[in-house]
C-alpha cells in the first residue's frame, strides 16, 4: 500500500469538484455484482458518463507524469476512472474487488492488479468515510488530503466506513500492471527508489549504472507486455 501525494493540483481538484457537484449521480449498486450489492450503499457517476470520462482523462494525464506512481504500479492498462460520493450514513462494507473487469465501451478486459482511490475532498470536510484496507499486517485506515491517492493490491479486503457528516467524494479505478506478482513488483519498486537515492548522492557512478542495469534486467524477465 502506497500513499502518492499531490497527484492533482488544488486548481485541478476545484475544477473537478465543480463539475462533479453539478452532475447527476446514480445508485452505486449498479456497478457491482450480487455480493458487493449486499454491502454497498453510495452513489456514483454512470460508467459512461461524459462528465466522468472527461474528468477521468485529467486524472490519467496527471498520473502519466508522476514518477512515484509509475515506479510503484508499472501500469500497462487502466480502467477509466470512476467517481463516488458518500454522505448521510452511506458506506461500503468489507469486500474484495473483482479479479477481471471489462473496460466500458470496449471488448477489452484487464486483470485488476492494483486499486486506486484519489481523494477529492479534504479530511476535515466530512466525518467517517475512512478507507480500511486489511492485509497480512493488519488493518490500515486511510483518509488523505484532496489530490492525494492511495494505491493498494486489488486482492486486499477493504471497506469504507459510514460518513456521518459532510460528503466524501473520490475517484477510484483499477489497473493491470506489467508485473502481476505483488512481491516482485514491490521488490522492483524498492530497488528503483534506492537507485534514485543513490543517484542523488553519487551521480551516475559505475555502481549506480550497474544497479540500474540489474533493475531493467529483472523488469525484462518479469514484465508481460
UniProtKB/Swiss-Prot annotation:
According to the lineage, what is the superkingdom?
Answer: Bacteria
Note describing how the cofactor binds: Binds 1 Fe(2+) ion per subunit.
State the EC number(s): 1.14.11.-
| Cofactor(s) needed by this chain | Fe(2+); L-ascorbate
**What PROSITE patterns has UniProt attached to this entry?**
FE2OG_OXY
The record's InterPro entries line, in alphabetical order, gives: Oxoglu/Fe-dep_dioxygenase_dom, PKHD_C, PKHD_hydroxylase, Pro_4_hyd_alph, Pro_4_hyd_alph_FE2OG_OXY
Give the molecular function GO annotations.
Answer: 2-oxoglutarate-dependent dioxygenase activity; iron ion binding; L-ascorbic acid binding
Tell me the keywords, alphabetical order: Dioxygenase, Iron, Metal-binding, Oxidoreductase, Vitamin C
Residues engaged in binding 2-oxoglutarate? 168
Locate the Fe2OG dioxygenase domain: which residues?
77-177
Q: What GO terms describe the biological role, i.e. biological process, of this protein? A: DNA damage response; intracellular iron ion homeostasis
State where Fe cation binds.
95, 97, 158
Recorded protein name is PKHD-type hydroxylase HEAR3399
Q: Supply the source organism's classification.
A: Bacteria, Pseudomonadati, Pseudomonadota, Betaproteobacteria, Burkholderiales
